[in-house]
């Protein structure tokens, strides 16, 4: 009231606002006395944390969907496996992850895989009494590995763990300039069920600014290759608020993505990380060149809805433009 600014998530600072709604939904088990209705949860989030109605309803909707997903996995006796590949074609402007340009570190990939294989052996022993629910290979960009390096890694993973109850096996293909038919065939050969082809934007000028050395056309070609190789579960990542982008840029991106029609979409609100080159870029160009609003988030949400998608997870980060969220 004093500043004229409204924060859509109110005073909430945690990364998982859906946990609040989930807590009440889990307490509403059959036989519970005085269970909270969705209207009660909405009022609680608005009155306690000053959340907007829109964001509170989004959290409740996603929590209900998450609850159904969790009921289908071994929530207490199971585990999920994440494997990180810390190499990329180049380092993006906004990135603060542990990632090394593959062309400078190519000679060390074999050593990294050897070390990773030792860690896989350790994890296998540590988790032998648990049930593996899902596997996610991320990075970095896992597809910076050569086809035979991918086969070496995937072979080790498949030989080390019981996949009989795995619901999903994801490899983040990520950058279009790292995706080839041979690599896609290697993923398919070892039973990968889901991949990500992540353009972040479908505007060429922005791709150039953020340091992604590929074209919009390469994104479209990589997506088509994946479909040709039989992948029926393809995700795409987008970032809203990239340098110089306006709602018109987001509209163009969503039009291009809708034509490809991925099976899922992850929409990130740009987060400014101290360890990224973006911090230096802002010093030189000004933060006013970064725009993300409820309006641009809504453009993305409407585009996802046109592809018959519904949000199923949500998280937030520090330093996010307009205090917004990331939604899948």
Where are these regions (language model features)?
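Residues at alpha-helix termini
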Residues: 2-3, 28, 48, 161, ...
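Auxiliary Fe-S-binding modules of radical SAM enzymes
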Residues: 1-35, 282-328
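Short glycine/serine/threonine-enriched helix-capping/active-site loop
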Residues: 83, 267, 314
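Short, flexible loop/turn elements at secondary-structure junctions
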Residues: 85-87, 175, 316
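Conserved non-cysteine loop/helix-boundary elements of the Radical SAM core domain that shape
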Residues: 99-300
């Amino acid at each position: 009231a004093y500043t004229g600014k409204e924060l859509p998530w109110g005073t909430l600072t945690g990364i998982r606002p859906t946990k609040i709604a989930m807590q009440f939904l889990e307490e509403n088990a059959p036989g519970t006395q005085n269970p909270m209705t969705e209207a009660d949860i909405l009022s609680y989030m608005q009155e306690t944390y000053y959340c907007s109605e829109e964001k509170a309803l989004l959290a409740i909707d996603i929590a209900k969907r998450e609850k159904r997903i969790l009921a289908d996995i071994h929530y207490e006796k199971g585990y999920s496996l994440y494997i990180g590949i810390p190499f990329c074609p180049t380092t993006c402007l906004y990135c603060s992850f542990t990632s090394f340009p593959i062309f400078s570190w190519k000679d060390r990939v074999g050593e990294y895989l050897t070390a990773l294989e030792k860690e896989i052996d350790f994890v296998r022993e540590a988790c032998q009494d648990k049930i593996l629910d899902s596997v996610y290979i991320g990075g970095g960009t896992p597809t910076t590995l050569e086809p035979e390096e991918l086969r070496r890694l995937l072979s080790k993973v498949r030989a080390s763990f019981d996949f009989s109850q795995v619901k999903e096996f994801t490899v983040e293909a990520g950058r279009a300039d790292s995706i080839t038919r041979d690599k896609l065939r290697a993923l398919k050969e070892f039973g990968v069920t889901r991949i990500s082809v992540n353009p972040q934007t479908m505007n060429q000028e922005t791709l150039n600014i953020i340091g992604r050395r590929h074209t919009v056309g390469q994104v479209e070609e990589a997506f088509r290759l994946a479909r040709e190789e039989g992948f029926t579960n393809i995700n795409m990542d987008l970032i809203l608020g990239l340098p110089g982008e306006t709602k018109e840029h987001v509209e163009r991106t969503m039009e291009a993505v809708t034509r490809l029609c991925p099976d899922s979409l992850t929409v990130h609100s740009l987060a400014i990380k101290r360890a990224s080159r973006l911090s230096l870029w802002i010093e030189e160009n000004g933060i006013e060149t970064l725009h993300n609003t409820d309006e641009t988030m809504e453009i993305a949400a409407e585009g996802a809805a046109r592809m018959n998608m519904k949000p199923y997870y949500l998280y937030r980060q520090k330093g996010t433009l307009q205090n917004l969220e990331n939604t899948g």
